């Protein structure tokens, strides 16, 4: 049993289907979107869902689950015209740990301009053997009808990727 686990870990294979939702929120709007996504996934029957606030949970706990489960969703806001620094730090940790063989989804939050989504897309394009699930999108400040529909579609795509 232990040897089998070691082989899975050494090859960075997925241990079990599941979704990590990691988010940074400055005023609560991105946190609300992350929570709503987790709810939608749970209602769709997804059993393994972990919701992590990157501002309050040590990355070591999150990275462990990133390698345990099949899907990672990152939601983060713009800050000073780029990706929030905590999200940037998390992406750096993923790079250091050789993020691979996983599905990922991206959601940015912005009030005006900014490079949060392009920054995330550029970073994930460097990872090998990863697959984008759903269409990346930007929430303009808070969820509205159009971005709630985008969140619905993302949840459906994530559920499909787990089958």
Positions of PLM-derived features:
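Glycine-rich phosphate/diphosphate-binding loop of Rossmann-like nucleotide-binding domains
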Residues: 28-31
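Active-site loop segments of alpha/beta catalytic cores
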Residues: 58
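Cytosolic transmitter module of two-component histidine kinases
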Residues: 18-26
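FMN-binding flavodoxin-like domain, especially the glycine-rich phosphate-binding loop
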Residues: 1, 5-18, 36-54, 62-163
């Amino acid at each position: 049993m232990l040897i089998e686990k070691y082989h899975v870990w050494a090859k960075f294979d997925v241990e079990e289907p599941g979704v990590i939702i990691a988010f940074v929120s400055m005023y609560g709007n991105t946190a609300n979107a992350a929570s709503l996504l987790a709810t939608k996934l749970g209602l769709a029957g997804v059993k393994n869902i972990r919701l992590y606030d990157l501002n309050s949970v040590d990355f070591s706990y999150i990275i462990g689950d990133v390698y345990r489960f099949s899907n990672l969703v990152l939601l983060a806001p713009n800050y000073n015209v780029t990706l929030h620094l905590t999200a940037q730090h998390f992406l750096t940790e993923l790079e250091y740990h050789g993020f691979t063989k996983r599905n990922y989804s991206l959601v940015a939050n912005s009030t005006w301009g900014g490079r949060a989504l392009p920054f995330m897309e550029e970073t994930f394009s460097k990872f090998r053997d990863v697959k984008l699930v759903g269409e990346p999108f930007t929430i303009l400040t808070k969820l509205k009808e159009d971005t709630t529909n985008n969140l619905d579609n993302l949840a459906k795509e994530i559920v499909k990727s787990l089958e």
